[in-house]
């Protein structure tokens, strides 16, 4: 592959190969979350305690996100990706041996540590090899693998759990992740590119502290990251609680709840390349207008879950349709968001810039699951949990609209760093 890909086409082999990484990650993570009704039953835990799993998973990944991004910039995308995915697979296999729930939380903490390097590594791979014309779409295609994995995990692992126990299901998914790591090691060819470095040569010699100072002085990046905090609540609370919400508030079986989570992931599979495609093709490359559309849509759909879906005993068909729409919005924004972030930093700071943004999105993901579950425990229903999320997203989207004026005033399609070859 050339250092810079052709503007006029998407290179699907490259994109689909890297998408298998997110497929394996979400097959394990979302699949494990779909097993929460089984795990709650075995360990006799509350909804708030169940929500702590996702918090522990993202906690260490949030704390060290910037350092992980720096590592990705240093060792390259291939080594970071291979190490991360194999370690995640091995740790999920260890989940199956845990006799107590607190040990599962410790393993979630360690799994998040291994996962922390994967997103910066994959984002760096895309920014190094894909030109701006199709970058948001390409990032979405890679992220789409996560939705495929999430659907497979949420649909298949509960079936395995019903027949063989939840521990056997997580062993199988863990070995699959290790297999993907070996696949990436064999077939992904990383190229060292000097693209963008002639205009950015000074950045290649920066220390970690100097790089961090540049990021926190980037007001445009901070504005986008502020919205990322709100969007992060959706990827934390919703998948962590969705099967419990569908079983308890909507009175369905655990298998139907797992399938609903799978449909949520299918929606995310459509949304991840979809939002990027809308930005690339219909918004003339305007990432900011795309993010405003995502934030407004998320506030609206979570409000509808609060005042309509939860309270009026929807049919099974409506549950599936609502799950799909929620997935498009709540689980589909990542490709567009991280493309925006990467285009706001120097090409040589893509990894650490991604890590910086992950601090914000993962903070939302860490805080939201226990809060979402606590509100449901207090009121005996998830209705007020959905309402709280809608309010938070609405307020931070309004703040983003007000403060992002200087970004939208730029020449359409231009960002501080275009990551293009000279």
Regions found by a protein language model. Name each.
Residues 30, 58-66, 150-151, 265-269, ...:
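Residue-level signature of mid-helix packing/kink "hotspots" within the transmembrane helices
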Residues 74-84, 281-296:
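Cytoplasmic membrane-interface "Motif A"-like loop-to-helix N-cap segments
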Residues 2-9, 191-223:
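Juxtamembrane intracellular "pre-TM" segments in multi-pass secondary transporters
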Residues 285-337:
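C-terminal transmembrane helical hairpin of 12-TM major facilitator-type secondary transporters
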Residues 107-148:
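Cytoplasmic helix-loop-helix junction between adjacent transmembrane helices
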Residues 32-33, 220-273:
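Extracytoplasmic gate region of multi-pass secondary transporters
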Residues 63-99:
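Conserved MFS/SLC helix-loop-helix module at the cytosolic interface between two early adjacent transmembrane helices
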Residues 142-190:
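Helix-loop-helix hairpin linking two adjacent transmembrane segments in secondary transporters
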